[in-house]
């Protein structure tokens, strides 16, 4: 059923709940399950408390892993006409304090059990959602926001610098959810397996809001690395829709029994490049194709996705309905023809209005209505998008630009790896290669690179190839570029 994109998230939430109040709605790995009516009732209790006790606060924080409680907290904030700010509880105090200060957070919704497990200091007034009074007045008196009101403030992953506040409106999220629904239509018989955190845009839009907006059930677990629990959860709830990342999917292919994922129909992966070796390993184990997609937090996040009936190997699919993708010269931003590689620019109804309290950053990032992604790629003649690298993932050696991704791909069947450029007095930069399979000698890695047909300039020296325990990753599963570069500098 097509959903209105000129409404608000709260209006759509109520409409779905009132349409079939007794249908199961949300569940999690703790065993908690709510019907649509119960979900709405609990969200209204949160909203009522916020309206009575936090009337003057525009932004409300949330510090919870993906769960029924986290969903209810976010829905309650929305019903109260306020803005949800889901905090990245894995990023450390400095990142969290910066987010709290930028958004002026005075209240953070959490739970006693979660705080105790996390060991996080009280950085604002921490309110345990489970302790809110059950007799609280419902949210009937909430000021009704408009579709252009800010629904949430997310933060960039900070892989290449200081995280930025990214506001998304009700209209942004509704349009993005509708775009995915038109590309891969769900039904009320479907169940989403939701394991990505709500502070990640992929998790916020597509695991928190997409299921409830389209009448799907959803089953949550708060740690995407808990393969055993995720397998049990998928089997128990007969999950059909799953959002993940290639890194996590590779773990699942090695730790989850094939029958546990047998009900899954659609597995969408994003946040990093889907390598052929990972896709092949997953299909061999589960018999399911991974569907590569592409997005950015600033774009809602969804931009493009492959489907089971329309896919191109190596691509991230065609743009979602209403999304305009332009490939441009990185220096001049002049449009390029199909097949030509350039900077990926994107516009559409899910594009953020601008960075939060950062007009200069917004002017740099949005040109002629298009968001400048910082990613390089091309469109083929049929409109399929191919992402080749991030512009930040190049090194300048002796005046020549050297991409890091082809080097990593040359040894991806041997070992996970990461290439970074560190300062070098003679050549400007020097390539450092980190890999995580210490039983393979660095000489073998070097030999494989020499045989891969890469230009000699692209191949790190033998002494610059280092085995490490792990390559730092973000909660989304993609490489934490900043920390990985710091690791490369420390060993190089």
Question: Can you describe what each PLM-predicted range is?
Answer:
Residues 174-191, 199-240, 255:
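Conserved AMP-binding/adenylation subdomain of ANL enzymes
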Residues 239-244, 253-312, 324:
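Gly/Ser/Thr-rich phosphate-binding loop
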Residues 318-322, 334-364, 397-402:
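Conserved ATP/PPi-binding loop(s) of AMP-dependent carboxylate-activating enzymes
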Residues 429, 454-478:
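AMP-binding/adenylate-forming catalytic domain of the ANL superfamily
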Residues 108, 242, 348, 353-354, ...:
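AMP-binding/adenylate-forming catalytic core of the ANL superfamily
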Residues 14, 24-54, 61-71, 75, ...:
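Conserved AMP-binding/adenylate-forming core of the ANL superfamily
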Residues 33-37, 151-178:
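Conserved AMP-binding A3 loop
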